[in-house]
Structure formats: C-alpha cells, structure tokens
Amino acid sequence: MQWHCLPFEQLTTHQLYDLLKVRVDVFVVEQNCPYHELDEHDRHPDTQHLLAYDNDQLVAYLRLLPPGVTYDNVSIGRVLTTGHARGKGLGHKLLTRALDAAQVQWPDQTIDIGAQDHLQEYYKGYGFNAISDMYLEDDIPHIDMRLEKAITR
C-alpha cells in the first residue's frame, strides 16, 4: 500500500483524476446523489488530500480541511474506500492516518466531521461524539461529530 498526503498543488494529474473519479463513483453514482462533487475546498492551500494506492489503483481517499473552511475547526471529509477494497480494515487505516496527519498539520486541534448517520458508532470508536441532531444532506441522514483535541494514535 502506498500512502500520499498532499496539498492540491502537489497532486499529479493522475492522482487528481483518480481521486475525482472515485469520489464521483462512490458519492454520485453508488449513493445515487446527483450533486456537484467538485468544490473550492479541494484547492484551498491548506487542504490535504490523503490517498491510498494498492497496485497503482486508488483504493481509499479523504481530505483534511483547515479550520474555517467547512467548520470552525479542522475537518475531515469525502471519506471513502472503493468497493473491492471494503471489508479489509482499510477504512480504519485511512482514518488513523488522517488523525495522525491532522495532528502534524494542526497540532492538538479539535476535528469536526459531517458523518453519515449509520457510521456514528464507527467514528465513536475513534473518540468522536455527536454534536448535532440527525439532518439530511443530499437525502442521506448525517450527523455532525467532534473529536476534541485530536491526539496521535
């Protein structure tokens, strides 16, 4: 497994294509949510893109956003593993690496996420707690969650 954590400007054209393709595959096609997948947050100079490759195939991805971009705190979004890579513990490795990267980039900062409601217990396992009621985003139940003062795992 090859891991890369890069700002937008350091992504290769192949990495950019790969991450946009898997995001559309998962969030637009698989979850049947026809919405604009691209936004200005990807290009923010402090946004970090965390990519995991297995044999030159992008199998997991998320982005780390600095405070003030989507939440007042640091945030993690667009968390995904590709279909054939699921059920192998890759999501846990991805989130652990994300928390470590956030600690390096923004030491001891609180982290917020807009989690799909059915993943609440998963994120609780990392110390996140619900901070909102359930709400619909693109017709999918979500809940805001927070990890106070992220620590290296």
Language-model segments: what does each one mean?
Residues 1-57:
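Short amphipathic alpha-helix that is part of the acyltransferase structural core
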Residues 39-44, 68, 136-137:
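A short beta-turn/loop motif at secondary-structure boundaries
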Residues 51, 57-66, 73-75, 80:
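Conserved beta-strand in the GNAT
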Residues 67-76, 86, 105-109, 139-141:
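A conserved beta-turn-beta hairpin within the catalytic core of GNAT-like acetyltransferases
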Residues 81, 87-100:
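Conserved acetyl-CoA-binding loop-helix of GNAT-fold acetyltransferases
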Residues 95, 102-116:
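Conserved GNAT acetyl-CoA-binding A-motif
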Residues 112-114, 124, 129-144:
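Conserved catalytic-core motifs of GNAT/GCN5-like acyltransferases
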Residues 148-153:
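Generic C-terminal helix-cap and adjacent flexible tail
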